[in-house]
């Protein structure tokens, strides 16, 4: 067996279908454009969320350097 036929198989995050992890799979890790777009829509609808502390919009934000938001002249 040639080494070029060995590849990893992952599961589509949307439907669970096996997907070969190689250059020929255009929508990897998804099995199809449909599953990719459904997943994108789920993010847009805020069905998914990355855990974190709630943000209070009344408090000024700080950037990585510790500076506060834009000047309020």
From Swiss-Prot:
Needed cofactors: Zn(2+)
Assembly and interaction partners: Interacts with GyrB.
Role, per record: Inhibits all the catalytic activities of DNA gyrase by preventing its interaction with DNA. Acts by binding directly to the C-terminal domain of GyrB, which probably disrupts DNA binding by the gyrase.
Taxonomic lineage: Bacteria, Pseudomonadati, Pseudomonadota, Gammaproteobacteria, Methylococcales
Gene designation: yacG
The entry's keywords: Metal-binding, Zinc
A single GO BP: regulation of DNA-templated transcription
Domain of life: Bacteria
Gene3D superfamilies xref list: Erythroid Transcription Factor GATA-1, subunit A
Family (UniProt): Belongs to the DNA gyrase inhibitor YacG family.
InterPro entries: DNA_gyrase_inhibitor_YacG, Znf_NHR/GATA
Positions of region (Disordered): 47-73
SUPFAM superfamilies, sorted: Glucocorticoid receptor-like (DNA-binding domain) (SSF57716)
Ligand binding (Zn(2+)): 12, 15, 31, 35
GO molecular function terms listed in the Swiss-Prot or TrEMBL record: DNA topoisomerase type II (double strand cut, ATP-hydrolyzing) inhibitor activity; zinc ion binding
Lipid metabolism is among the record's keywords: no
Note accompanying the cofactor annotation: Binds 1 zinc ion.
Protein name, as recorded: DNA gyrase inhibitor YacG
